[in-house]
């Protein structure tokens, strides 16, 4: 019988060795799905430029930059040719088309959620809504606006790359639907990714 003992314990040792070689399973119930070739990760552009050109026979023009920042996109720059000391509405519009003389080709405000028009940061509003610009005595306004919940160049539904920025003749009243009673479109520029 001493010869049978190693034969009886050999299968038991193999079973124990196989169990020990199995890696422990991690709990993945709350983890996000792994990125595969079928679902690539979306990355944002690092910068876009907006060259605002006159519309509706105005003399308004300017240059803005857009960069991803926090949970949104930050717009900065300068707009000139505005009525001195006046407020002017500025919005991101749904189409990157400034070909119409009155910039109507840019469509409505960028509004992927179907929200009512309002004031950014104060309740429901379009994703493209921003606070009014304030022109100085020379008719120049500095833009320093943050659009929360939008992206830049990732191709998603909330991406503002390829859309247009519009400056209006009047201030936005933040109440009137669908566009804040902001008057004529006096400048238009497409948000173009540069890197």
Task: For the regions a language model picked out, list residue spans one by one.
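N-terminal leader/targeting pre-sequences
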Residues: 2-6, 20-195
């Amino acid at each position: 019988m001493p010869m049978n003992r190693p034969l009886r314990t050999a299968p038991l040792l193999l079973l124990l060795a196989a169990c020990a070689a199995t890696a422990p399973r991690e709990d993945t119930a709350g983890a996000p799905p792994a990125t595969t070739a079928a679902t690539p990760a979306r990355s944002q552009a690092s910068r876009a430029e907006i060259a605002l050109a006159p519309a509706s026979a105005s003399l308004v023009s300017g240059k803005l930059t857009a960069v991803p920042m926090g949970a949104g996109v930050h717009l900065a720059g300068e707009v000139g040719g505005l009525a001195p000391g006046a407020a002017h509405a500025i919005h991101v519009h749904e189409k990157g088309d400034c070909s119409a003389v009155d910039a109507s080709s840019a469509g409505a405000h960028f509004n992927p959620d179907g929200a009512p028009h309002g004031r950014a940061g104060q309740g429901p509003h379009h994703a493209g809504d921003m606070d009014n610009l304030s022109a100085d005595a020379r008719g120049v306004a500095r833009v320093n606006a943050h659009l929360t919940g939008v992206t830049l160049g990732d191709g998603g539904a909330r991406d503002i790359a390829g859309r247009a920025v519009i400056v209006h003749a009047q201030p936005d009243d933040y109440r009137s639907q669908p566009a804040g009673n902001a008057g004529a479109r006096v400048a238009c520029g497409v948000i173009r990714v540069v890197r």
